[in-house]
């Protein structure tokens, strides 16, 4: 029994303390605009920041209005390997939803939504 515990304890420790990046999915940690925010401009700069590297060429960001109609986005380059950026121009006042889907460097897909309202004067 002692021999069994002698080699399984270090093995379990290696498994449990393994590289967090190996098990990490790309989770959204910050967005601009943040969820349920009111934006006071007809131009909205979108930044989605994740907790790990993403495969930007295999990610999607879509914007829809309150009726679910797609709204054009201009994707922009980000220097950070964990961030997506886009700009929406000429938004009318109303509710909008950002729909994102990313492929993490670990090969897992995560997706989510961020809602915001435009109330510009």
What are the residue ranges of the model-derived segments?
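Extended, polar beta-sheet/loop recognition surfaces of beta-rich domains
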Residues: 31, 37-41, 45-52, 107-121
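A glycine-anchored, Pro-Gly-centered beta-turn/N-cap motif
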Residues: 87, 92-98
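Cleavable N-terminal signal peptides
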Residues: 10-12, 21-22
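Short, surface-exposed alpha-helix to beta-strand junction/turn motifs within ectodomains of secreted
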Residues: 47, 51-71
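Cleaved targeting-peptide boundary
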Residues: 23-31
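N-terminal signal peptide c-region/cleavage motif recognized by signal peptidases
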Residues: 17-19
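Bacterial N-terminal signal peptides that target proteins for export
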Residues: 1-11
């Amino acid at each position: 029994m002692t021999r069994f515990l002698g080699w399984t304890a270090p093995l379990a420790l290696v498994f449990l303390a393994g590289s967090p990046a190996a098990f990490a999915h790309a989770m959204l940690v910050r967005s601009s605009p943040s969820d349920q925010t009111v934006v006071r401009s007809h131009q909205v700069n979108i930044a989605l920041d994740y907790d790990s590297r993403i495969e930007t060429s295999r990610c999607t960001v879509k914007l829809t209005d309150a009726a679910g109609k797609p709204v054009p986005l201009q994707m922009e380059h980000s220097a950070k390997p964990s961030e997506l950026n886009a700009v929406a121009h000429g938004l009318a006042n109303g509710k909008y939803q950002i729909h994102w889907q990313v492929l993490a460097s670990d090969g897992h897909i995560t997706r989510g939504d961020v809602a915001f309202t435009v109330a510009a004067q």
